[in-house]
Amino acid sequence: LLDCFRPGTCERLGIGPDDCAAVNPRLIFARITGWGQDGPLAKTAGHDINYLSQTGALSAIGYRDRPPVAPLNLVADFGGGSMFVLVGIVAALYERERSGKGQVIDAAMVDGVSVLAQMMWTMKATGSLKDQRESFLLDGGAPFYRVYECSDGKYMAVGSIEPQFFAQLLVGLGLSADDVPNQFDLGHYDDMRAIFADRFASKTRDEWSAVFAGTDACVTPVLTWTEAADNEHLAARSTIVASDGVDQAAPAPRFSRTPCGPVGTPPRGTTAIGAIGW
C-alpha cells in the first residue's frame, strides 16, 4: 500500500499501518513524504524546492552571482522520493520472503536527497566543497565542467575532467597547453573560463557538435526536450518512444531475460471509467 498523505492521515481514516497489518500482516506499507513521518516539519506542506532548500543541495545549484536554481523537480520528488521508496519496497519484498512479514517504509525526500548528496558531504568534510556556488569541481566552478554559450545562443556541455579528455578539449578548441593555465590551477580558473567562453562563442552549437563528434573530449550539445526526442543515440536505444502520438520514456533499466513490454497510454475520455461501471 502506497501512502502519499501527510503523516497521520491514514490513521485518521482508519487505514493506518496497524489497522492494515491486523488484516494482512504481510502487507508492505510504503509511506512517501517530503519531510518524513516525524520531526518538526513532518506535517508541514512543501514541494521539491522546499525539501531541497533544507538539505543544502539547493544552495549549491546555480551561478555564484545569482540566486540558486531549482533543477526542475527531478532531485527531491523523483530522485530522493520515488526512487528511494521503490528501492525500499523491493527490499521489503525480498525480506518478506524470509520473514513472512510486512513492514512500514518511511521514505522522506529530505533523507533521499541527503543520501544522493553523500559524496558532497564527504567533499565538504575534506575541505574541497565550500558553502559557495561555482567553487567545486562539479558545480560549474571548473572551466572544464560547465556549460558554454555558442554564437547562435545555444549551448555546449563540457565535462573534460580527466587530463586526457582535457587535452582533447583543447585540440577541439584550437588551443595548445601553452594557451591556457594549468588545468587544476584554481587561481586562474576565471582566466580559463574566459578563454573557453570566447572560443565557444565563435561557432554555432551544431558546428561545435561536429568538431567534437567522435572524440573523447566529453563535449556534447545541450538539447531541448524536442531535440532530445529526435536524438540519434536515444533513438537507437528507443529511449524515447511515441505511443499514440505521445513521446514518453521507455522503461529502465532493461532486463535480458524479462524485458518490459511496449509503453502504452491510458484510454482517453470516459472509456476507462465506463469499463468498470462508473
For the regions a protein language model found, what residue spans apply to each?
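Conserved PLP cofactor-binding pocket of PLP-dependent enzymes
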Residues: 213-235
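Aromatic-enriched alpha-helical interface/lid elements that frame and gate functional surfaces
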Residues: 144-215, 219, 276
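Active-site-adjacent "lid/gating" segments in soluble enzymes
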Residues: 11-156, 160, 260, 267
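Residue-level detector of anion-binding/catalytic polar loops
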Residues: 1, 26, 218
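Rossmann-like NAD(P)-binding element
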Residues: 1-11
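A structural signal for well-ordered alpha-helical segments within the folded catalytic domains
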Residues: 80-87, 164-167, 206, 271
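Flexible, small-/acidic-enriched active-site or ligand-binding loops
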Residues: 186, 243-278
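Residue-level signal for nonpolar/aromatic packing positions in well-ordered secondary structure
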Residues: 2, 20, 29, 48, ...
